[in-house]
């Protein structure tokens, strides 16, 4: 799996950063691409990357602020002509996302040549697709804003060859059945496959947050995550200023990393008050402290393997 950032600025774009957009490549578990938020200009950003809109099967919107959705109508329209013809799309987001898209399409007389399935979240959501489980939980941003916990499929445990030989089953095609089925038959007897396999291993867990001030659901979403994508609109100054505007300060994110046992954190949605030089200087200062957890400030077009 791989996460790619097409926009990392908060509120407004800058000369160096677009507004929010994240792509999650599901390979090797699936050939699909999932997008999280579609800020203005996202489709133009994607033109600079190998990702194709035709491979985008799902779009997850965290909340309805413009810097997270203003690029959606244009991207949906362009998908019709960039390999998305007749390929269904699932659009998940807060209440109102369906009305926003349909009104935009109607007023602009745009016609999509593929079906969209809308899933509007109320308080929380559990969604299953291609072995993936996605949980959405409500955050604290003044308007409905959600964080998504994406759990990849489990990897089947290793076959216990000696145990199979003990029942007279030698290596061969039957082993694939043991690996991929709940039960198998040998010499007229039915066996439980789990008795001949090691423990299954949970696939990668990715937590992707919408805008929020600290809240209890953050720990639910990010618990034991392999990768967490979190906003830190404010990366210096006084923490209360961030929280007054229902946003997170870098210190809030560091506390969450430690509480939730997050392995790697990618910080996005940086205020447009910070230029690249500012961000680099703040980063160097922060990592001098031995208590600072593992994190990166991300920039547009950064990609990270999971």
UniProtKB/Swiss-Prot annotation:
Q: Name one Pfam family in it.
A: Lactamase_B_4
Q: Show the InterPro entries listed in the entry.
A: RibonucZ/Hydroxyglut_hydro, RNase_Z/BN, tRNase_Z_dom
**EC number(s) on record?**
3.1.26.11
Q: Where does Zn(2+) 1 bind?
A: 63, 65, 141, 211
Q: Which Gene3D superfamilies match?
A: Ribonuclease Z/Hydroxyacylglutathione hydrolase-like
What does the subunit comment say? Homodimer.
Q: Tell me the NCBIfam families matching this sequence.
A: PRK00055.1-3, RNase_Z
Which protein is depicted? Ribonuclease Z
């Amino acid at each position: 799996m791989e996460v790619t950032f097409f926009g990392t600025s908060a509120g407004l774009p800058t000369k160096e950063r677009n507004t929010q957009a994240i792509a999650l490549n599901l390979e090797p578990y699936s050939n699909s691409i999932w997008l999280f938020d579609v800020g203005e200009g996202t489709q133009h950003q994607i033109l600079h990357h190998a990702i194709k809109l035709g491979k985008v099967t799902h779009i997850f919107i965290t909340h309805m602020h413009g810097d997270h959705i203003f690029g959606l109508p244009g991207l949906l329209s362009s998908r019709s002509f960039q390999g998305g013809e007749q390929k269904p799309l699932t659009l998940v987001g807060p209440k109102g996302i369906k009305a926003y898209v349909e009104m935009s399409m109607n007023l602009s007389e745009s016609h999509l040549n593929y079906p969209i399935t809308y899933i509007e979240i109320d308080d929380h959501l559990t969604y299953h697709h291609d072995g993936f489980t996605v949980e959405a939980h409500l955050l604290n941003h003044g308007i409905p804003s959600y964080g998504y916990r994406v759990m990849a499929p489990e990897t089947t445990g290793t076959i216990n060859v000696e145990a199979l030989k003990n029942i007279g089953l030698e290596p061969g095609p039957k082993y694939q059945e043991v690996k991929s089925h709940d039960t198998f038959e040998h010499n007229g007897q039915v066996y439980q496959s789990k008795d001949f396999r090691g423990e299954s291993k949970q696939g990668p867990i990715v937590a992707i947050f919408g805008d929020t001030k600290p809240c209890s659901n953050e720990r639910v979403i990010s618990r034991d995550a392999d990768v967490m994508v979190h906003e830190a609109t404010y990366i210096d100054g006084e923490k209360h200023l961030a929280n007054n505007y229902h946003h997170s300060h870098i210190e809030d994110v560091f506390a969450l990393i430690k509480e939730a046992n997050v392995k790697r954190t990618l910080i996005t949605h940086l205020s447009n008050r910070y230029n690249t030089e500012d961000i680099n200087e703040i980063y160097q200062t922060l990592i001098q402290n031995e208590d600072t957890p593992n994190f990166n400030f991300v920039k547009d077009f950064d990609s990270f393997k999971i």
